[in-house]
């Protein structure tokens, strides 16, 4: 894999890099973050909280970073003035995706999936999973918080919008989502919440 790509979504810079399966993402993320912040990788002030979420606070209070790896790729995000989460998912057949959705998703999302034929159902399942995981990574609890505690739905233009979320996550209207194909067969999502709204 030789993919090198970068994007800018609002206040967030993102980079996609090749990544060796089975290796931790943090060393490579530190390299990218250090370059972007103008410091040596070992001086990037990443600290993990009790749940394992990496933070740049308190040293860089207006910055946030996150990363995700899937397959042979690593996605790294660096934001200013936001709390962010990223997710990268390699799309692969999920024969029991409705079982997974029934177990983890919000009832409104399950209803959306049930109404679809298999191909669009799988596409929407991965979009929902990726969006939800990115938001929960931004929040700092990960999947253990509960995927059912937030609900996305496609807007008329097809973009996913957060319809509802547990009040602990803040106001649904303040969350922003960007989703895209980061690489062949790899779906990416970025969720961010303005620090000024916390």
Kindly give the residue locations of the regions a language model identified.
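Core catalytic alpha/beta fold that binds nucleotide/phospho-ligands
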Residues: 1-198
């Amino acid at each position: 894999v030789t993919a090198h790509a970068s994007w800018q979504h609002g206040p967030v810079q993102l980079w996609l890099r090749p990544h060796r399966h089975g290796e931790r993402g943090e060393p490579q993320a530190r390299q990218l973050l250090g370059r972007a912040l103008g410091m040596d990788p070992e001086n990037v002030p990443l600290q993990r909280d009790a749940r394992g979420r990496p933070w740049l606070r308190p040293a860089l209070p207006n910055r946030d970073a996150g990363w995700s790896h899937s397959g042979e790729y690593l996605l790294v995000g660096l934001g200013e003035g936001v709390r962010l989460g990223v997710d990268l998912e390699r799309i692969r057949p999920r024969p029991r995706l409705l079982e997974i959705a029934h177990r983890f998703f919000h009832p409104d999302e399950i209803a959306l999936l049930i109404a679809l034929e298999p191909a669009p159902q799988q596409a929407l399942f991965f979009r929902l999973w990726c969006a939800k995981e990115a938001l929960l990574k931004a929040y700092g609890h990960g999947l253990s918080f509960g995927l059912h505690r937030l609900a996305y739905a496609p807007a008329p233009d097809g973009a996913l919008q957060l319809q509802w979320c547990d009040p602990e996550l803040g106001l649904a209207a303040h969350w922003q989502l960007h989703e895209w194909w980061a690489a062949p067969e790899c779906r990416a999502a970025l969720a961010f919440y303005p620090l000024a709204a916390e």
